[in-house]
Amino acid sequence: MTNVVVIGSQWGDEGKGKIVDWLSERADVIVRFQGGHNAGHTLVVDGVSYKLALLPSGLVRGKLSVIGNGVVVDPHHFVAEVEKLRAQGIAVTPDVLRIAENAPLILSLHRDLDALREDAASNSGTKIGTTRRGIGPAYEDKVGRRAIRVIDLSEPETLPAKIDRLLTHHNALRRGMGLSEISFNALHEELTSVAEHILPYMDQVWRLLDEQRKAGARILFEGAQGALLDNDHGTYPFVTSSNTVAGQAAAGSGLGPTALGYVLGITKAYTTRVGEGPFPCELHDEIGKHLSTVGREVGVNTGRPRRCGWFDAVLVRQTVKTSGITGIALTKLDVLDGLDELKICIGYRLDGKEIDYLPSSQAAQARVEPIYITLEGWKESTVGARKWADLPAQAIKYVRQVEELIGAPVAMLSTSPEREDTILVTDPFEG
């Protein structure tokens, strides 16, 4: 038995929700370790759909769910998401949900700054494509050592000084942007009004997880977004504001790296991306439209359409290395049904030279051209397949080619949005 880290191996939206739900039924503890409420996913349990963005997926199954210190927590969204789950009959109490006392808070001033910057960048043609939910500015305050954290809400005697320090920074920014300043009283009221809703869930998460590990609990670390959006290893600056690679599961939860275990990379059978940034295999033709339409490629949280393209083995192979992926869960294979031929990117051409990696340079990333191999497609349906024998021969060939090119085996194969439509090759908890 081992613990499991689940991450997206591409730019997010790989289908983590279904796989995490499948695994969470077998887990004892589910942990969020990075990001905020900027990446949503939908779980379908007994025919009921649950849309989550901040809360761990294990809540819908009554499992102990933990929001780690690596997550930035919007208290207003937290309350709204909890209330929505309760309205759907899910019990959300401190018995099943814990929040790290050292998790930073996202406040209204962070959302304001995020939106203002994105608007300014849009006007200058340099926008990143953020969700405008304050994630980036909240992480900036964390790194700048001025963030207000969950535990600060429990110490009213020291909170005023922390508010002053935060406002000194933000009001200087607002003055420079021609905006009115935020008053001490307004921010103090915002914080005190949410304290009673957050503090009952506060805990020393690092200690809790260590105790659970020693007791033999199966711990599932639930990553958000994708490794190619990692602040260090992604397509910088078109990335998120946190680390999304598997190593962050340790830093963002307080449980040491030796406890992480199996790393499962959720990998879509083609490639999608939301927002701005390089996308070497992007398709603007009828195939791209097919992938978008059949794959229903629209963001759960934002409603933004996703850009679509062929499978990029170069990128996933790189993620396998940077995240130490043990095996992948290949999703949305059924979206490829009916295509006459399929292409897989096996390398890039940069200024006339062939390379087998994505360069770090933003300019070089924009210039790379994909090198493809072409495989025969299949006409049969793979929808609902639950064993290898149900798959067309060409579909199996496609899967084997992906394994060979990325240097990692397929541990799970998803053939529809339904959780039961999954071919299990290797149980990550037993891996």
Swiss-Prot record:
Compartments (UniProt record): Cytoplasm
Binding, IMP: 13-16, 38-41, 131, 145, 225, 240, 304
Gene Ontology CC terms, in alphabetical order: cytoplasm
Disulfide bonds listed in the record: none
NCBIfam families per UniProt: PRK01117.1, purA
Family according to the record: Belongs to the adenylosuccinate synthetase family.
Protein name per the record: Adenylosuccinate synthetase
Organism expressing this protein natively: Rhizobium rhizogenes (strain K84 / ATCC BAA-868) (Agrobacterium radiobacter)
